Amino acid sequence: MKEKKRLRLEREAREREKAEKWEPIFNVKEKFAFLRWLDPFTYADMFLEKIGKKENSAISWAVYLATAFLSALLLYNALGLLFHSPSPMVIVVSGSMEPSFYRGDVMALSGWSLEELNAPLVEMPGTEIDGLDISEYSYSECSVKGVEGLEPCRSVIKKIQSGALQVSAKDVLAEKIVFPKLGKEIDITKKGDVVVYFSETQGIPIIHRAIAKIRAKDGFFVLTKGDSVLNSFIDQDTALSYGAVPFNKLQGKTVFMIPWIGYVKLILLDDLPCFLSSPVTKAKCQFP
């Protein structure tokens, strides 16, 4: 009897010791119990219990999916109001900004004024440039590996297309933007803010760096370029953008990045349909 009593007392002592050890954690859990009301699925569970369908897997799945969709929609719109941007979240769809950002990264965007945009300013108060090719008022200059000095980037592009110049993308780089009528040159750097605009020619949002901002007679505009070493030319010298991007066509500038979480969407909704499409369509796909 004494032995049994001793064992019982030891067991009770161990249980008290264990309870005392975990008590702070339980207290913290109780302290932050109110956070459950921030979880939208708490309300989904309450709804299912109220209608008596929580054990019905089909109805439960439908309610949970609807809850997830509505929660994402509300969060998206809330971020839009918070960041003053109609498109607060955008997925990087190509590698044109590597190593700054990678395909599948999600960028959070905010609205801003021209003064707040970090990029060299060019004043052209007497010139209207909306809808004009940039060759009407400026041109970019490129360096080519093995060639001394700089030459107009569009001249380099023509030589590459004709076969007169055999180089890889890494061997060519846009270095300057020249505004001959103003006697002004701007070095192309990676110090400007990253902005997002919709490319009419490509049908996708472009996430590139602002390399110059222009205050013209007919409004504000931005010149852009990707950071990647494989992205040799500014957007306005390629098929991404016909002219300088009007300020009101910008969706926002990036304020922070969430890595990789957009990759699932790209694989399921972009890559897979492209992979299964015709050869003509497949050639336009943005594969990694």
Regions found by a protein language model. Give the residues of each.
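Protein maturation boundaries and topogenic segments
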Residues: 1-179, 257-288
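Short coil-to-beta transition motif at edge beta-strands of beta-rich domains
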Residues: 120, 181-199
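Extended, hydrophilic extramembrane loops/domains of integral membrane proteins
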Residues: 211-269
